[in-house]
UniProtKB/Swiss-Prot annotation:
UniProt name for this protein: Molybdopterin synthase catalytic subunit
GO annotation (BP), single: Mo-molybdopterin cofactor biosynthetic process
Family to which this protein belongs: Belongs to the MoaE family.
GN (gene name): moaE
Quaternary structure note: Heterotetramer of 2 MoaD subunits and 2 MoaE subunits. Also stable as homodimer. The enzyme changes between these two forms during catalysis.
Its biological purpose: Converts molybdopterin precursor Z into molybdopterin. This requires the incorporation of two sulfur atoms into precursor Z to generate a dithiolene group. The sulfur is provided by MoaD.
Its EC number(s): 2.8.1.12
A GO MF term: molybdopterin synthase activity
Residues involved in substrate binding: 39-41, 103-104, 119, 126-128
Classification via SUPFAM superfamilies: Molybdopterin synthase subunit MoaE (SSF54690)
Superkingdom as given in the UniProt entry: Bacteria
Reactions this protein catalyses: 2 [molybdopterin-synthase sulfur-carrier protein]-C-terminal-Gly-aminoethanethioate + cyclic pyranopterin phosphate + H2O = molybdopterin + 2 [molybdopterin-synthase sulfur-carrier protein]-C-terminal Gly-Gly + 2 H(+)
Length: 155
């Protein structure tokens, strides 16, 4: 049986507990579930919102490709990846990655792999909106994100 993969790109918030429940529903072969939730953060106290845009259709396809690669590479029994778009205030959910496997290490590795590639390969763009009402810049990609992704190619 192929491992189920759930991918959604949506404007609405998600319920982490409900997503984990759906991931594990009627499964007795799962011994470990790992979740990662990414939140909108305000590091300097000047952010009122973060605006996320994506390339519809292409973002979903790329995330699905990444999830299927993780399932194959780590022997996952299920994977879920949800990414939001639109305007979000600090503290709001942005992304959820959940992986299930018989053992914890595969679940951890799968979640890390999905997040590292999602962050660098899926077509999303972020724009900051400042508390003073001004629009900030589009957020640039970080070298650290590329390095995190590249570690998987050296294994």
């Amino acid at each position: 049986m192929a491992a189920p993969v759930t991918v959604r790109v949506q404007r609405d918030d998600f319920d982490i507990a409900a997503e984990v429940s759906a991931l594990c529903r009627a499964r007795t072969d799962i011994g470990a579930v790992v979740t990662f939730s990414g939140l909108c953060r305000d590091e300097a106290g000047a952010l009122s919102a973060l605006e996320l845009e994506h390339y519809p259709g292409m973002a979903e396809a790329e995330i699905e490709r990444i999830c299927h690669e993780a399932v194959e590479r780590f022997g996952l029994q299920a994977a879920t990846a949800i990414h939001r778009f639109g305007r979000m205030e600090p503290g709001a959910n942005i992304v959820l990655v959940a992986t299930a496997s018989p053992h914890r290490q595969a679940a951890f590795d799968g979640a890390n792999f999905i997040m590292d590639f999602l962050k660098t390969s899926a077509p999303f763009w972020k724009k900051e909106h400042h508390a003073d009402g001004s629009a900030g810049d589009w957020v640039s990609a970080k070298d650290a994100d590329d390095a995190a992704r590249d570690r998987w190619t050296r294994r």
